[in-house]
Amino acid sequence: MNMTEKIQTYLNDPKIVSVNTVDAHSDHKYFESLEEFSEGEMKLRQSLNGKWKIHYAQNTNQVLKDFYKTEFDETDLNFINVPGHLELQGFGSPQYVNTQYPWDGKEFLRPPQVPQESNAVASYVKHFTLNDALKDKKVFISFQGVATSIFVWVNGNFVGYSEDSFTPSEFEISDYLVEGDNKLAVAVYRYSTASWLEDQDFWRLYGIFRDVYLYAIPKVHVQDLFVKGDYDYQTKAGQLDIDLKTVGDYEDKKIKYVLSDYEGIVTEGDASVNGDGELSVSLENLKIKPWSAESPKLYDLILHVLDDDQVVEVVPVKVGFRRFEIKDKLMLLNGKRIVFKGVNRHEFNARTGRCITEEDMLWDIKVMKQHNINAVRTSHYPNQTRWYELCDEYGLYVIDEANLETHGTWQKLGLCEPSWNIPASEPEWLPACLDRANNMFQRDKNHASVIIWSCGNESYAGKDIADMADYFRSVDNTRPVHYEGVAWCREFDYITDIESRMYAKPADIEEYLTTGKLVDLSSVSDKHFASGNLTNKPQKPYISCEYMHTMGNSGGGLQLYTDLEKYPEYQGGFIWDFIDQAIYKTLPNGSEFLSYGGDWHDRPSDYEFCGNGIVFADRTLTPKLQTVKHLYSNIKIAVDEKSVTIKNDNLFEDLSAYTFLARVYEDGRKVSESEYHFDVKPGEEATFPVNFVVEASNSEQIYEVACVLREATEWAPKGHEIVRGQYVVEKISTETPVKAPLNVVEGDFNIGIQGQNFSILLSRAQNTLVSAKYNGVEFIEKGPKLSFTRAYTDNDRGAGYPFEMAGWKVAGNYSKVTDTQIQIEDDSVKVTYVHELPGLSDVEVKVTYQVDYKGRIFVTANYDGKAGLPNFPEFGLEFAIGSQFTNLSYYGYGAEESYRDKLPGAYLGRYETSVEKTFAPYLMPQESGNHYGTREFTVSDDNHNGLKFTALNKAFEFSALRNSTEQIENARHQYELQESDATWIKVLAAQMGVGGDDTWGAPVHDEFLLSSADSYQLSFMIEPLN
């Protein structure tokens, strides 16, 4: 075959997954001497990262066929940074699709056919001179991550071919190197048969996106290493099994091993390599401390390869001793039932895509630890090696997932239709499946943090995936196997050791936990579960490998899931997902915005569905983390006026690392704080007396106990708050108008009330409050109007609420005042507007304004309830005040936005913020900034002029934003929210929850909805600050 024929053969044959690649192996480092090891830099590794030359072809017809030859003229080639995605450096355009394949509707294809019209080819060239340390040795090249398929040439010689975008592709190139300048040429094809296996829900970005480096090996080299640190939780002894394979001149060589930590050597010894270059050592009864996410204790294993007692290679490995097993249908870590407080995580950076840095990883892992997240699923591909090292070090449990997803071959528009799904049980796809399983296992097997192997994601089920599971079990008896897809094809239920589901509702999960009922989703939409077989009790431990679809303003009802921890077989879940996948794009005016699918004219696209993170794409925190942090905490605190009850859900650690701060607040103002140290053993609960320092008062009192770090850790400073508990002795204002003589002007069109430094106008024509002027400053820009609806959230749209509740939007915007009731007395003015709602017969809403001699405005809105109508999102008033009033303080539940189904983690207190900061910049603008249970709030300018709003008789909900509901609703991106000439205030009797079960049909749970059959009353007071 000529080169063109060879390329087409490799691209189009699913059985060919690699040519001339090095066998997958462990990711360990190695050094030629102890001195080099102590310095920490591998001299036998030479980075090729940096500027490369490139030619980009839109399809295979435009490719540079001879670019790899040494005599090729490279003058006209462009430049590109490696690692980095093509599309983010001007070569091609990003495309976001979820389930559908990127060519859907453009080319009609079925597996294993490969797109032709859009199969872009990037031809890379890099020149290098071999470092002296690598000369006269076997030399290899390693591509840590390339999407999708890669051909490699050195000095015009074809080296090899490889697939699997997310694990290393390595080739030996020793025979092709020359003295001086060497030419490396790499052709990266966007599509091959491998593309059918990489249909993950992410931006389709291609190119060389992870490190590229050369490496050489010593004359005898530990090529592969499997280290297993077992912990016997009954004897509390460790066992270390070392299995390694050497290559080169290994005859008569010894391996010296030293296991140690900062306290000294645990064990040491040596053993000889056998005739096949292999060695196996088992070291028992080791006095060690176990590894867990709570206490990620690591030991240093140093292997010395000895040649006549001379060190010729040093191999360091971090070892964590732990035993993860399924016993009596429970997953146990070191003998204790584990609960995953997990999150799914894509590798993502808003500027560089999946080409992320160690800085990104450190930020991610610290944020996870700071918010009580203890587990991560590498959705849906193996991550960079450094991530696993950090998880070992910082303490995170990892479900390591193979690079396999074929969602678009069997699920269409939410319906299961597997007529042409792959890999199924097709022999031609088995080599690729096993290759991907092997690549992941071999590289990641030595990481203590990896406790479960996952066969992939959303690829239905069949014998090919069953063979992957069998492979994992055959090579590793220390980790169970996970695969969710069997829920769609129960014939292959044996693939997974864990009952794993996606987006199962709390009631469905509870049904499994109490009856053992299995579901088979194959004949129904993925929104609902079909009936299954009763087994009376669960046969496997349960996790939700994906749940709480946190798209936009979401995360409501998380407590309904964490409440299931009372069932032993419920072992947690993994929120979808960690970070918004949004890419910075430049507007014509030079400013940047975070783009989503479709913004690059990418078609087909799944648009804003890429914004599901609990952190924003720019790595700032979303308000959703407030709830996650509280509910994921292993420390639970319940408070009353005299004591605190603390439950320690840690598996292994007591509370000696924490300080507890007991505080008392009166009307939200701290009046006392005392420090305590409580001793609660892991898994236990205890109640302690607390001497809350409090004086007799008519104020509302808050009794609070906060748990904070006693000392700084790697992931948080001293004093970092873990969680807190509160007990509130509620006292809401019952203020009433003060009766005193008023100056009232009863005009034909307006009722005017005037007093010292104030004037109020209530309009007969506009049927609302039109002016509130204090100290000569006008506050009302747009008078209050009824509000029954909000700027719909992603979850609202997914559940069909804009359609279902459309009548309420009309009702709020176009209500008609049918009666204006005016009561004027010498010391009192009260005006009531009676609203009739369009399309809703016999429904009235009364809004009353009463003004007293101090200029205070008492506002009441009443909705009496009407059976048979759709629910509404909210009930209250929306109006606008001057744009200069941007400073916001409130006494309510914060510090982030709060909703009735997102209250855990929102604590009652006084908070200072601004109108700008209280609006969360979700990828698509939507409802945001609500504060539940508010007693009062103020909005002011920089001169302390402003208004104070006080709840009467019952706390209200409110928001103060830069834009109106309508403006937010109409915007598709944050930059489309133009600078407003007003500050928009909403004061609400109630707002429904935001939901979070999923974003494609799940309603807000009934207990968090607002029934139109119920009555609602809003009552509050407006007064000037000065």
From Swiss-Prot:
Keywords, alphabetical: Glycosidase, Hydrolase
Catalytic activity from the UniProt record: Hydrolysis of terminal non-reducing beta-D-galactose residues in beta-D-galactosides
Entry's EC annotation: 3.2.1.23
Pfam family, one: Glyco_hydro_2
InterPro entries recorded: B-gal_small/dom_5 (IPR004199), Bact_Beta-galactosidase (IPR050347), Beta-gal/glucu_dom_sf (IPR036156), Gal_mutarotase_sf_dom (IPR011013), Galactose-bd-like_sf (IPR008979), GH-type_carb-bd (IPR014718), Glyco_hydro_2 (IPR006101), Glyco_hydro_2_AS (IPR023232)
Positions in coiled-coil regions: none
GO cellular component, as recorded: beta-galactosidase complex
Active site positions: 458 (proton donor), 546 (nucleophile)
UniProt-recorded Gene Ontology molecular function terms: beta-galactosidase activity; carbohydrate binding
GO BP terms: lactose catabolic process
Family affiliation: Belongs to the glycosyl hydrolase 2 family.
Domain of life: Bacteria
Gene3D superfamilies documented for this protein: 2.70.98.10, Galactose-binding domain-like, Glycosidases, Immunoglobulins
Protein name: Beta-galactosidase
Organism: Streptococcus thermophilus
Gene this chain is encoded by: lacZ
Lineage of origin: Bacteria, Bacillati, Bacillota, Bacilli, Lactobacillales
